Amino acid sequence: MRIKLLIIAFAASLLFIPQSQAQTSASGFPKGELSNAKNHTGNIWLSELNVGDSTFDPSIAMATYDAGAKLDWHIHPGGQVLLITEGTGYYQERGKPTRIVHKGDVIKCVPGAEHWHGATPNDTFAYIAVTPTAKGKTIWLEPVSDKDFSSVK
Protein backbone atom coordinates (compact mmCIF):
# COMPACT_ATOMS: atom_id res chain seq x y z
CA MET A 1 0.00 0.00 0.00
CA ARG A 2 2.84 2.37 0.87
CA ILE A 3 4.47 1.83 -2.55
CA LYS A 4 1.17 2.59 -4.30
CA LEU A 5 0.89 5.87 -2.40
CA LEU A 6 4.46 6.81 -3.33
CA ILE A 7 3.76 6.08 -7.00
CA ILE A 8 0.57 8.15 -6.92
CA ALA A 9 2.38 11.03 -5.17
CA PHE A 10 5.22 10.92 -7.72
CA ALA A 11 2.80 10.87 -10.66
CA ALA A 12 0.85 13.79 -9.18
CA SER A 13 4.06 15.78 -8.68
CA LEU A 14 4.79 15.56 -12.41
CA LEU A 15 1.76 17.76 -13.01
CA PHE A 16 3.54 20.64 -11.28
CA ILE A 17 6.79 20.56 -13.26
CA PRO A 18 7.02 23.66 -15.48
CA GLN A 19 6.42 22.78 -19.11
CA SER A 20 9.84 24.04 -20.24
CA GLN A 21 11.51 21.57 -17.85
CA ALA A 22 9.21 18.68 -18.69
CA GLN A 23 9.69 18.82 -22.46
CA THR A 24 12.53 16.85 -23.94
CA SER A 25 13.38 16.23 -27.55
CA ALA A 26 13.40 12.77 -29.10
CA SER A 27 17.19 12.80 -28.58
CA GLY A 28 16.62 12.94 -24.81
CA PHE A 29 18.01 16.45 -24.33
CA PRO A 30 15.81 19.24 -22.96
CA LYS A 31 13.83 21.06 -25.64
CA GLY A 32 14.73 24.33 -23.94
CA GLU A 33 13.07 27.71 -24.09
CA LEU A 34 11.21 29.25 -27.00
CA SER A 35 13.63 31.77 -28.50
CA ASN A 36 12.49 35.36 -28.73
CA ALA A 37 15.60 36.42 -30.65
CA LYS A 38 15.16 38.54 -33.74
CA ASN A 39 17.50 36.44 -35.92
CA HIS A 40 15.02 33.82 -37.12
CA THR A 41 11.59 33.20 -38.61
CA GLY A 42 9.15 30.79 -36.93
CA ASN A 43 9.33 28.97 -33.60
CA ILE A 44 12.73 27.72 -32.46
CA TRP A 45 13.53 26.30 -29.02
CA LEU A 46 17.07 26.52 -27.67
CA SER A 47 18.68 24.58 -24.83
CA GLU A 48 22.24 25.57 -23.87
CA LEU A 49 24.01 22.32 -22.98
CA ASN A 50 27.44 23.93 -22.49
CA VAL A 51 28.22 27.64 -22.51
CA GLY A 52 31.70 28.02 -23.99
CA ASP A 53 34.34 29.19 -21.52
CA SER A 54 38.12 29.17 -21.10
CA THR A 55 38.15 25.53 -19.95
CA PHE A 56 35.54 24.01 -22.28
CA ASP A 57 35.58 26.30 -25.31
CA PRO A 58 32.80 25.11 -27.56
CA SER A 59 29.28 26.23 -26.97
CA ILE A 60 26.99 23.21 -27.28
CA ALA A 61 23.28 23.75 -27.80
CA MET A 62 20.19 21.76 -28.73
CA ALA A 63 17.96 23.59 -31.24
CA THR A 64 14.45 22.41 -32.13
CA TYR A 65 12.48 23.98 -34.99
CA ASP A 66 8.80 23.96 -35.90
CA ALA A 67 8.10 23.17 -39.56
CA GLY A 68 9.18 26.11 -41.74
CA ALA A 69 11.27 27.83 -39.04
CA LYS A 70 14.70 29.05 -40.12
CA LEU A 71 17.64 31.11 -38.92
CA ASP A 72 18.81 34.24 -40.74
CA TRP A 73 22.02 34.14 -42.74
CA HIS A 74 24.95 34.11 -40.32
CA ILE A 75 28.67 33.43 -39.85
CA HIS A 76 30.54 31.48 -37.16
CA PRO A 77 34.11 32.84 -36.95
CA GLY A 78 35.32 29.52 -35.48
CA GLY A 79 33.06 27.27 -37.57
CA GLN A 80 30.31 24.97 -36.34
CA VAL A 81 29.33 21.30 -36.43
CA LEU A 82 25.63 20.37 -36.57
CA LEU A 83 24.61 16.86 -35.47
CA ILE A 84 21.11 16.37 -36.89
CA THR A 85 18.99 14.53 -34.30
CA GLU A 86 15.42 14.83 -35.62
CA GLY A 87 13.41 15.55 -38.73
CA THR A 88 14.37 17.04 -42.06
CA GLY A 89 15.98 20.41 -42.64
CA TYR A 90 17.83 22.65 -45.05
CA TYR A 91 21.43 23.87 -44.95
CA GLN A 92 22.85 26.37 -47.43
CA GLU A 93 26.14 28.21 -47.77
CA ARG A 94 26.06 31.47 -49.73
CA GLY A 95 26.46 30.82 -53.47
CA LYS A 96 25.91 27.06 -53.17
CA PRO A 97 22.79 24.91 -53.63
CA THR A 98 20.62 24.23 -50.60
CA ARG A 99 21.17 20.79 -49.09
CA ILE A 100 18.42 18.66 -47.60
CA VAL A 101 19.63 17.17 -44.31
CA HIS A 102 18.16 14.35 -42.23
CA LYS A 103 18.45 12.76 -38.80
CA GLY A 104 21.93 11.25 -38.49
CA ASP A 105 23.64 13.73 -40.82
CA VAL A 106 26.68 15.71 -39.66
CA ILE A 107 27.15 19.18 -41.16
CA LYS A 108 30.51 20.96 -40.90
CA CYS A 109 30.20 24.73 -41.33
CA VAL A 110 33.68 26.02 -42.10
CA PRO A 111 34.89 29.11 -40.23
CA GLY A 112 33.69 32.33 -41.85
CA ALA A 113 31.17 30.73 -44.23
CA GLU A 114 27.91 32.66 -44.64
CA HIS A 115 25.12 30.13 -44.24
CA TRP A 116 21.64 29.42 -42.90
CA HIS A 117 19.75 26.36 -41.71
CA GLY A 118 16.16 25.57 -40.87
CA ALA A 119 13.27 23.13 -41.01
CA THR A 120 11.54 22.12 -44.22
CA PRO A 121 8.02 23.54 -44.71
CA ASN A 122 6.40 20.23 -43.68
CA ASP A 123 8.71 18.74 -41.03
CA THR A 124 10.21 19.66 -37.69
CA PHE A 125 13.98 19.72 -37.36
CA ALA A 126 16.46 19.46 -34.48
CA TYR A 127 20.20 19.33 -34.02
CA ILE A 128 23.00 19.63 -31.52
CA ALA A 129 25.29 22.51 -32.49
CA VAL A 130 28.94 22.50 -31.43
CA THR A 131 30.32 26.00 -31.92
CA PRO A 132 33.89 27.03 -31.01
CA THR A 133 33.77 30.47 -29.38
CA ALA A 134 37.44 31.48 -29.05
CA LYS A 135 37.40 33.35 -32.40
CA GLY A 136 34.21 35.26 -31.64
CA LYS A 137 30.45 35.00 -31.44
CA THR A 138 27.96 34.40 -34.25
CA ILE A 139 27.65 37.30 -36.69
CA TRP A 140 24.04 37.73 -37.81
CA LEU A 141 23.20 38.90 -41.32
CA GLU A 142 19.95 39.41 -43.26
CA PRO A 143 16.88 37.13 -43.14
CA VAL A 144 16.66 34.25 -45.62
CA SER A 145 14.54 35.31 -48.59
CA ASP A 146 11.45 33.37 -49.63
CA LYS A 147 13.27 32.73 -52.92
CA ASP A 148 16.24 31.10 -51.15
CA PHE A 149 13.95 29.09 -48.87
CA SER A 150 11.73 27.82 -51.69
CA SER A 151 14.56 27.14 -54.18
CA VAL A 152 15.17 23.61 -52.90
CA LYS A 153 14.56 21.00 -55.58
Name each region found by the language model:
Residues 1-7:
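Bacterial N-terminal signal peptides that target proteins for export
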Residues 73, 91-92, 114-120:
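Short beta-strand His + acidic residue motifs that chelate non-heme Fe in jelly-roll/DSBH
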